[in-house]
Amino acid sequence: MPGHRSKSEKKDADKQLRRDPYEVLGVLRNSTDQEIKSAYRKLALKYHPDKTANDPVAADMFKEVTFSYNILSDPEKRRQFDSAGFEAVEAESQELELDLSSLGAVNTVFAALFSKLGVPIKTSVSATILEEALNGRVSVDPLVLGQAVSKKVEKQCAHFYAVTISEEEVSAGLVCRVESSSKSKFKLLYFDQEANSGLSLALQEDSKRTGKITSAGMYFLGFPVYRLDHTINSMAQAKDPETAFFKKLDGFQQCEVTELKAGTHVFAVYGDNFFKNVSYTIQVLCAAAFTQEKEDLRSVEAQILTKRAELAKFETEYREVLVQFTDMTSRYAQEMQSIDELLKQRNEIHSAYTTIPLMKRSSSKNRMRKSSFKKAAAKAPAPTEQEEEEEEEEEEEEESSRQKNKKPSTCDKSETLKKKSKWFNLHLKLDKKKPC
């Protein structure tokens, strides 16, 4: 009868059964981020639990596809895997992308609670929305270039917009921005048009909080532009705030698409709140009137790239200095303790150069004096009667001499005056008729 396997044995077995993430997604090792993302979405849509509810094999495939994508979509984890395989990747810390539309009420509450506490939770677009878009069963509203539209979309639902651009507008550049004054969470999506009139998800930008609003944008300006994935820094912040500083720019990656072709393009706003609907404003602009802003963006992103390289070098220097500082701090404490011990030994040696016993406290000295005085008095012989009489006579003579030398005080003077005034203040009755 086979025994039960421990958790560690099961974990080792799972590691042995893992397939190469590139093999799982069907991509090459030099594939671009866009190719990896497209392959993942097709497989995730194929094996999603909403479509294969009673198929355990499909459920396992969906987990494997999601796990592989979580490695290859993260630049740092992909680099670690390419260099050292699964052992270099912290498998237990891989976050799964949650499809909130497939969660029950209880799980949604827990996910919202963890998100409120600062735990980074990745969410994905509902598989139902992606399937409907791929089959061309979504309603697409026209959007005029340069005109802002404000609406409200339900959670885990999407509003689709189509905008048509010319060759001149393509060369000038195009910008699509979405803002939410209610600080709602949403995703800005861009779809490629398939041959069967269907729409396949090509680009996705999660909203981020900027000041008093949340916003997301896509910039097609004809030159490389970059996006900042805040999730990488959030995960690093949760693990180690110090490391988070050095990983702050790890999510600064180049966007897959830098320009669009002339024609009609489809964008969508996906509600990503846990419970509430999302209020938003979407606007697609031609960048012809923003020449200076284009140059400023190109310049500042070049500086950020330089700073990212400098930050990696600075981290190495910082770690080396930190080790030295830790060593110096430890040595400081050891040297201080050693010096105190040596000075203490020196004082003890100095104190040893004497034949006099150590001094005791004053209170003990007084007690010793009193006890020795009592002992001496007890041992002395008792005085004779003649000696006692002589002592009494000497005491009387001393007392009389003190009384003579003592000056009268103010109280004594007042007493004598009172005694004298008693004689002169006698009330005598005299008869004036009789002569004295």
From Swiss-Prot:
The J domain covers 20-85
**Regions annotated as coiled coil:** 291-348
- Indicate where this protein is primarily found: membrane
Q: Name one GO cellular component term.
A: membrane
Membrane topology qualifier: Peripheral membrane protein
Which segments show compositional bias classed as Basic residues?
Answer: 362-377
Q: Where is the composition biased (Acidic residues)?
A: 385-399
Per its UniProt entry, which superkingdom is the organism in?
Eukaryota
Q: For this entry, list what GO says about its biological process.
A: response to abscisic acid
Cysteine-cysteine disulfides: none
Keywords of the record, alphabetical order, are: Chaperone, Coiled coil, Membrane
Q: Tissue-wise, where is it found? A: Expressed constitutively in seedlings, roots, leaves, stems, flowers and siliques.
Q: Where is region (Disordered) located? A: 360-416
Which compartments is it annotated to reside in? Membrane
Q: Is the Coiled coil keyword given for this protein?
A: yes
Stated family? Belongs to the DnaJ family. B/II subfamily.
Query: What does the protein in this record do?
Result: Plays a continuous role in plant development probably in the structural organization of compartments. Seems to not be involved in gravitropism signaling pathway.
Name of the molecule in the record: Chaperone protein dnaJ 16
- Which species is this record about? Arabidopsis thaliana (Mouse-ear cress)
What lineage does UniProt assign to this protein's organism? Eukaryota, Viridiplantae, Streptophyta, Embryophyta, Tracheophyta
